[in-house]
Amino acid sequence: MSIDLNWETLTTGPDGIALAERIRDFVHAKFQTVTLPRFIKGVKVHTFEFGSIAPEVELKDICDPLPDFYEDIDDDYVEDDEDEENSENSQTDEENEVAKTLRERRRLDRVERTANGSSHVSTPPAYIDTRYPGLRSMQASGDTGSPFLGVSTPGIPGGTSNLSYFHSQLASGLSGTQTPLAAVAGAHLPQGWPDRPSPSLHLSALRNQSHTPLSHTASERSMTPPQIADLNQQSLREKASVSTLAASSSTTRPATRDGVPEATIPEEHAGESEESTSPPRRFREPKVEDLQTVFRVRYSGNIRLSLTVDILLDYPMPSFVGIPVKLNITGLSFDGVAVLAYIRKRAHFCFLSPEDAYAAIGADEKDADASAGMKMGALLHEIKVESEIGQRENGKQVLKNVGKVEKFVLEQVRRIFEDEFVYPSFWTFLV
């Protein structure tokens, strides 16, 4: 179902101007934390404009929110609704600071897991099953023996496919609701969740099976069945930790709804002692009125971002002088899947990675027929940039490092977008 946006109302007027200024400040602050190459002195972001072209938004699904959206970021855990509302009014600024800290912690954990690869098995996500106590008894015994377990998927630490990601919770004995994308990608049960049947979710899971790559590595072919089972279990644990990114700081995981405490997980690295000082993750109790919508967003417009970069010249000595280079991002092309959840006067927003996007809504018919052009889930496809450097000689740029500067800036724009807006990173707004 397509949704029409009044783009002019959203992006103009006092509110639109203030929002554009906040985005400019945010991008500028992110560039100040980036490690610059030797030939660049500094980056300054001057203006941001939304442009006149509105994105195309299509509603794909309405379902239960992702488990990470229930994480409690208040200093004092509040279960009563009235106390929670009072806490929101008095601690808005403090919550924003804590939210920034949590996003930074998720980003650092993701970087650490990427560096360590499959050699490090992270702590599984400390999700608490609160809504579907009867789900374990309804699991099919044949699911855990699926031939798709352990399939290699490029770009995901741990080498596990999307389908094994969903089967991981079954294999480890956890509830289906503990799977971060079970809410959007479909349930494992033939009839969906017990209290919220959704045939579209089951169809999405079936579509996901048809797009799961079946390329095992040579080492997996040579392994005996017990070895393959061990490898699958290790990969499943790694995938579960990748979906959370905010590692639990305590050495024990919270007790499940059945009252059975989880096993103690020792620390493997001395560098993790700093994380042990941070408070453990806490989750709010889900309610029936909680809602999440899944959208497909397409955009090919004239959004503008103006910034300057100082290029250092090494003649007659290193870093002798800096010359400002003005870069204008004049447009970009985008195609991805967005998630918007509403939980207790809070709106949570994020985009899904390409793998999770296909798992959530399946492949579009237009994507299957298109041999070229944009492909769903690839997020930023194209960024148009123009550069200006003072005087020109015979229509050519005087400096030779302009191409390197443009490449560096575009890489940082992509990195900022993916680190801040792609799940498991998400933004929370008080509404």
UniProtKB/Swiss-Prot annotation:
<keyword id="KW-1000">Mitochondrion outer membrane</keyword>
<dbReference type="GO" id="GO:1990456">
    <property type="term" value="P:mitochondrion-endoplasmic reticulum membrane tethering"/>
</dbReference>
<keyword id="KW-0256">Endoplasmic reticulum</keyword>
<keyword id="KW-0496">Mitochondrion</keyword>
<feature type="compositionally biased region" description="Basic and acidic residues">
    <location>
        <begin position="97"/>
        <end position="113"/>
    </location>
</feature>
<feature type="compositionally biased region" description="Low complexity">
    <location>
        <begin position="241"/>
        <end position="254"/>
    </location>
</feature>
<dbReference type="GO" id="GO:0032865">
    <property type="term" value="C:ERMES complex"/>
</dbReference>
<dbReference type="GO" id="GO:0015914">
    <property type="term" value="P:phospholipid transport"/>
</dbReference>
<keyword id="KW-0445">Lipid transport</keyword>
<dbReference type="InterPro" id="IPR031468">
    <property type="entry name" value="SMP_LBD"/>
</dbReference>
<dbReference type="GO" id="GO:0045040">
    <property type="term" value="P:protein insertion into mitochondrial outer membrane"/>
</dbReference>
<feature type="compositionally biased region" description="Basic and acidic residues">
    <location>
        <begin position="255"/>
        <end position="272"/>
    </location>
</feature>
<dbReference type="GO" id="GO:0000002">
    <property type="term" value="P:mitochondrial genome maintenance"/>
</dbReference>
<dbReference type="InterPro" id="IPR027532">
    <property type="entry name" value="Mdm12"/>
</dbReference>
<keyword id="KW-0446">Lipid-binding</keyword>
<keyword id="KW-0472">Membrane</keyword>
<feature type="domain" description="SMP-LTD">
    <location>
        <begin position="1"/>
        <end position="431"/>
    </location>
</feature>
<dbReference type="InterPro" id="IPR019411">
    <property type="entry name" value="MMM1_dom"/>
</dbReference>
<protein>
    <recommendedName>
        <fullName>Mitochondrial distribution and morphology protein 12</fullName>
    </recommendedName>
</protein>
<dbReference type="Pfam" id="PF10296">
    <property type="entry name" value="MMM1"/>
</dbReference>
<dbReference type="GO" id="GO:0008289">
    <property type="term" value="F:lipid binding"/>
</dbReference>
<comment type="function">
    <text>Component of the ERMES/MDM complex, which serves as a molecular tether to connect the endoplasmic reticulum (ER) and mitochondria. Components of this complex are involved in the control of mitochondrial shape and protein biogenesis, and function in nonvesicular lipid trafficking between the ER and mitochondria. MDM12 is required for the interaction of the ER-resident membrane protein MMM1 and the outer mitochondrial membrane-resident beta-barrel protein MDM10.</text>
</comment>
<comment type="subunit">
    <text>Component of the ER-mitochondria encounter structure (ERMES) or MDM complex, composed of MMM1, MDM10, MDM12 and MDM34. A MMM1 homodimer associates with one molecule of MDM12 on each side in a pairwise head-to-tail manner, and the SMP-LTD domains of MMM1 and MDM12 generate a continuous hydrophobic tunnel for phospholipid trafficking.</text>
</comment>
<feature type="region of interest" description="Disordered">
    <location>
        <begin position="236"/>
        <end position="285"/>
    </location>
</feature>
<keyword id="KW-0813">Transport</keyword>
<feature type="region of interest" description="Disordered">
    <location>
        <begin position="79"/>
        <end position="128"/>
    </location>
</feature>
<feature type="compositionally biased region" description="Acidic residues">
    <location>
        <begin position="79"/>
        <end position="96"/>
    </location>
</feature>
<comment type="similarity">
    <text>Belongs to the MDM12 family.</text>
</comment>
<dbReference type="GO" id="GO:0005789">
    <property type="term" value="C:endoplasmic reticulum membrane"/>
</dbReference>
